[in-house]
């Protein structure tokens, strides 16, 4: 899809003009102009009750006298001054549905005239594009009959300000990153294993002059003492690989990097502490943290942000086997702390703790890890907010700001010293689980023991990384949040 922002005349020929109308006869400038061009036809529709402005209600008019456009699509925008982000998304989706049904190829949108609460024109355009791209997404790689794709080729926003051009640039890059994350996450685990994840990182690096890649294999992990990471991998025939993508693009090449770490369990059966069979197929999504880091690295490379960023994809697989690690095992982590394994299904933190130690070598400005870490986070926050844990208030606030800006929502959970009490073990420095209560927090507390040398935040995306049921599939979250956070570091 090609997106443009330019001033257009309502008399211009096109497949379709999209126009918004508020309730209570609140009309935009363009509505009044088209009404004049069509000799009061739109006002007649309002008087007859056919045009109400009700939220996301659409009416499609064809071949109007006085209008060069083949079609005029009018969409209701609710009450003026009360339109929320969620309602705006419903409007864009309603418009897209009609455009698809009518095989429209090119559109000029005057929805740039509608007002959103606490949002500007930049956001109006960017969110429209991201919504269109997200809604149009299809994953039919393995279907013999492919889904019908939209024929829509051109979408023009009626404005030519610099803000609009930046919105298109940001939206295109973020949408590309989200699609990449969704594609990898939706791949079946018999194909998407740790080696596949490393291969995708290689392809990304080869297609960007600013990206380079280092892959750490099991032999190197053993030399480094990454015993917790390796223990998780022991039950699988698929070897672990940690892919380190480096984006060196800051004006000061010696600037400390921002490090993103993504949990990449390409399949998690739970190991010896086997998960229930129901919905176990969804455990291919246990690598969505790595997928989101991959997507974010793709987005910032496309944007060419003047930053130094390192993205680590911690690829691994957790399966039961005669060689698998066991409850009761004691592991010596890379930083020397010992961990008693009480549950092999609490494996993500074991992979992450060694990865978080590994990234110390980069002397990072800050580190953000992203992981589908705990079911407890889903119980606490549901599927709308990612859980945020951090030892740094400024970093946490910056991430929450990015979450608000993008509507890729997050909610901060507490992290006080008391939670460390639940991680005590009579036999080792730490236990890998903290009991029944506050599981999302104690998982974060566990990780905090391996992040003493830098500013750190943890995003638990177990509830937000994928959907279930009829709309089953990866969401691509939190690529938008992470990319916005990085954009904000440039400002």
From Swiss-Prot:
Requisite cofactors: Mn(2+)
Keyword terms, alphabetized: Aminopeptidase, Cytoplasm, Hydrolase, Manganese, Metal-binding, Protease
Annotated binding of Mn(2+) 2, by residue: 263, 268, 286, 347
Annotated disulfide bonds: none
GO cellular component: cytoplasm
Molecular functions (GO terms): manganese ion binding; metalloaminopeptidase activity
GO biological process, one term: proteolysis
Subcellular location: Cytoplasm
Active site positions, chain numbering: 275, 349
UniProt similarity note: Belongs to the peptidase M17 family.
HAMAP family: Cytosol_peptidase_M17 (MF_00181)
Protein known as: Probable cytosol aminopeptidase
Gene that specifies this protein: pepA
């Amino acid at each position: 899809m090609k997106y443009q922002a330019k001033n257009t005349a309502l008399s211009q020929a096109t497949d379709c003009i999209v126009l918004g109308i508020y309730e209570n006869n609140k009309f935009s400038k363009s509505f009044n102009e088209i009404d004049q061009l069509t000799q009061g036809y739109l006002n007649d529709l309002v008087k007859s009750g056919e045009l109400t402005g009700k939220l996301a209600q659409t009416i499609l008019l064809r071949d109007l006298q006085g209008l060069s456009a083949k079609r005029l699509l009018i969409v209701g925008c609710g009450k003026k001054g009360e339109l929320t982000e969620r309602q705006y998304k419903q409007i864009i989706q309603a418009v897209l549905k009609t455009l698809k049904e009518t095989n429209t190829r090119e559109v000029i949108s005057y929805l740039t005239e509608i007002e959103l609460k606490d949002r500007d024109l930049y956001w109006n355009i960017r969110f429209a594009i991201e919504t269109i791209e997200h809604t149009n997404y299809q994953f039919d790689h393995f279907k013999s009959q492919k889904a019908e794709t939209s024929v829509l080729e051109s979408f023009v926003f009626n404005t030519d300000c610099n803000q609009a051009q930046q919105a298109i640039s940001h939206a295109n890059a973020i949408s590309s990153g989200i699609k990449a994350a969704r594609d990898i996450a939706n791949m079946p685990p018999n194909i998407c294993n740790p080696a596949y994840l490393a291969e995708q990182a290689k392809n990304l690096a080869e297609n960007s002059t600013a990206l380079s890649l280092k892959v750490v294999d099991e032999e190197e992990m053993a030399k480094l003492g990454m015993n917790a990471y390796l223990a998780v991998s022991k039950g699988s025939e698929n070897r672990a690989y940690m892919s380190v993508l480096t984006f060196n693009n800051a004006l000061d090449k010696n600037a400390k990097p921002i490090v993103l770490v993504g949990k990449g369990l390409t399949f998690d059966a739970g190991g010896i502490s086997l998960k229930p069979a129901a919905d176990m197929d969804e455990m291919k999504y246990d690598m969505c943290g790595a997928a989101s880091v991959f997507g974010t690295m793709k987005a910032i490379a496309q944007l060419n942000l003047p930053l130094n960023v390192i993205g680590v994809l911690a690829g691994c697989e957790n399966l039961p086997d005669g060689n698998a690690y066991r409850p009761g095992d004691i592991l010596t982590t890379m930083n020397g702390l010992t961990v008693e394994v009480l549950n092999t299904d609490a494996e993500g933190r074991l992979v992450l703790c060694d990865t978080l130690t590994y990234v110390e070598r980069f002397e990072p400005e800050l580190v953000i890890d992203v992981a589908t870490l705990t079911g407890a986070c889903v119980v606490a926050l549901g599927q709308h907010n990612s859980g945020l844990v951090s030892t740094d208030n400024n970093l946490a606030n910056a991430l929450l700001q990015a979450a608000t800006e993008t509507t890729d929502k997050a909610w901060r959970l507490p992290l006080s010293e008391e939670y460390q009490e639940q991680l005590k073990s009579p036999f080792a420095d730490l236990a890998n689980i903290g009991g029944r209560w506050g599981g999302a927090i104690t998982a974060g507390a566990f990780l905090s023991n391996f992040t003493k040398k830098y500013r750190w935040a943890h995003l638990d995306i177990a509830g937000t990384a994928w959907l279930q049921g009829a709309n089953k599939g990866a969401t691509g979250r939190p690529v938008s949040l992470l990319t916005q956070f990085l954009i904000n570091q440039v400002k």
